[in-house]
């Protein structure tokens, strides 16, 4: 049986309890407020970060994990007799995956597998959880890679994106247009498709958004035994009805908070469902 260590990055948004249970090594991204840098989830938490963004009306940036950090991490585990599976945020959203690939190339080791999750937040988290369960079953690194490359293709998501504040702060949207959209009560429904954020629809009103999310969730057959994850940041108007729906229908789910790295780009008032389609 291979002795395998899972390495990921802090965009996976898994809870401390899950990380400790499966002994997952989560490498923090850097959150930069000007010249000040903080390790995501270690030196700064999402609540304090959002408060600072609001107070200072400034948007921090994120920095990818550099190859030297991966080299150091991989070498340490290889020396301890581990094989490594390193699974990261979509390469379309960050250069972290490329950094991990450069580190593997530098070390010239067949005992390191690097995977582009093509996902983010708990979509990446679902893949990490799958890898952890497979490792517990005694899988080899070679077979684990095959399983995860297939599994990642079946992660589905339904995301309510209400606030345009961070798009304005980041210069991606004019304040005037944001005010116009907000005044109309328009909310965006998105998903992660082929490693990128994809706008599925523009929906007017909270009740219609909840209805659309539930309808889409119901329309996709789920793979039995795989987790359903509900993730939320400052959006109880959508989170609570979704939670009530799941509980009334005896649908088991995990509730996890959105982390710093993702919240910088999404802004507040986000709620999403991530799950695995039948395959």
Curated annotation (Swiss-Prot):
Name this polypeptide is given: DegV domain-containing protein CPE1310
Task of the protein: May bind long-chain fatty acids, such as palmitate, and may play a role in lipid transport or fatty acid metabolism.
GO MF annotations in UniProt: lipid binding
Superkingdom field: Bacteria
Cysteines paired by S-S bonds: none
Entry binding sites for hexadecanoate: 62, 94
Keywords: Lipid-binding
Start and end residues of each DegV domain: 4-277
UniProt keyword Cytoplasm present: no
Protein's UniProt keywords contain Hydrolase: no
Pfam families listed in its UniProt record: DegV (PF02645)
